[in-house]
Amino acid sequence: MKRLCIIVCCFLLAWGLAGCGNDEKKVLRVGTTANFPPFEYMKPNSDMYIGFDIDLMKNLASLMGYDEVEFVNVEFQKLIDGLETKKYYAVISGLAITPEREARVAFTKPYITDGLTIVLPVGTKLPNEAASLRRKRVAVESSSIAFDWVMKNTNHNNIVVTESTEEAIKAVIDNKADCMVVSKLSVAYLLANGFSDSVRFAGDNILFADEIAIAVNKDNKELLQKFNVELDKYCTSASYRNLCRTYFGSMK
């Protein structure tokens, strides 16, 4: 009888420890700005994060052994601040690699290439080049690569600064701006989802190409290496190609 009690106690102890282990999920906390479709945005009438970057990060995290990704929604201009103070382990938010950002954070290998383009009202014409923006009211999202490019290539007095790409489009539609400079992948999605009757691309070319990557804290070299190992494999997979088709319509 005593032996049976010992066996039962051992079983209960083992079961309890197993239960504790299951409760301790390995969670990857990631900063993002969820107002940049199709990269990251909120599902309508929901608190669910969706988008290309969201799915990409979940897939990478799973490959790296994480049980869950916890996304932290932060204003775009404060994303790197939060990474430096370690509020999260990584940032994914359509973030282009720039020398200024590289001085503060470490970037993974790029996972997609994007580019800037001019968007203008339907029925108007404008060459898709920097010279076209002279004396034009140009809408652009604050703290973005587009903002930096516009500041260097246009009259600063004519810039209409917005908090999102969608706000910039609305500024053009409402005649608060003559045109906008924006991520081509992002605006292509918006044009396909409700804005094609109002605005259009100025041309098929791009003004400036940029590479998009995940940012991590400079001292977290282990996490950076893990991301790069999985990106090398994932970005050549069928899953990645399907993800691109889902959000961009074709392989980029």
Language model features: what each stretch is:
Residues G16-G19:
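C-terminal motif of bacterial Sec signal peptides marking the signal peptidase cleavage site
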Residues M42-S46, M57-D67, A130, S143-S164, ...:
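Ligand-binding cleft/hinge of the Venus flytrap
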Residues Y66, L95-I97, K109-N155:
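A conserved helix-loop-strand patch within extracytoplasmic ligand-binding domains
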Residues V69-D81, K125-L126, I145, V160-D174:
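Short helix-initiation/N-cap motifs at beta->coil->alpha
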Residues I54-M64, T124, A131-S132, K136-R137, ...:
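Extended ligand-binding regions for polar small-molecule ligands
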Residues K78, G94-R104, K152, I173, ...:
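A ligand-binding cleft/hinge motif common to bilobed small-molecule-binding domains
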Residues E24-G94:
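Extracytoplasmic small-molecule ligand-binding "clamshell" domains
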Residues A34, I112-L120, K184, A188-D232, ...:
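Periplasmic-binding protein-like
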